[in-house]
């Protein structure tokens, strides 16, 4: 009887340990969010065929920027990708595996996939632009796909951001 209780307790603890080791979204945020967004964009007929998923993913990758573009590079979704582990994404997606589990498998193949992190967004309504570095001001403009031709000094970048702020910054009412 004691042996049976011990087996049950060990089984319970093993299950508990397994669930606590499962990958969380914040551990691999770029992967999880990109896989979810991609999976949501697929129609039902495409979701069943992993070859079609790979083709659609390559098209999807052509439109990605920044961290998502790097994620595509690591998976082999870009023409210039050095390696290709695309089937580690496409096959589990065709089985309707959740994004967290897919990213867990991808992390085992290539750990740098989960090293990708989104940069913290700057709240333009509360930040003092004069206190930011020029690098951060350039990043704001770059994120907006805007340029600042002829900007040499910090004041020039701040002026350009202030001009564009109404277009890109929507304050909650």
Curated annotation (Swiss-Prot):
Keywords: Developmental protein, Disulfide bond, Secreted, Signal. InterPro entries: ARMET-like (IPR045333), ARMET_C (IPR019345), ARMET_N (IPR045332), EF_Hand_1_Ca_BS (IPR018247), SAP_dom_sf (IPR036361). Disulfide bonds join 28-114, 31-103, 61-72, 148-151. It is found in: Secreted. Its main location: secreted. It holds the Pfam family ARMET_C. Residues 1-22 form the signal peptide. One of its GO terms (biological process) is dopaminergic neuron differentiation. One of its GO terms (cellular component) is extracellular space. Required during the maturation of the embryonic nervous system for maintenance of neuronal and cuticular connectivity. Essential for maintenance of dopaminergic neurons and dopamine levels. Belongs to the ARMET family. This is Mesencephalic astrocyte-derived neurotrophic factor homolog.
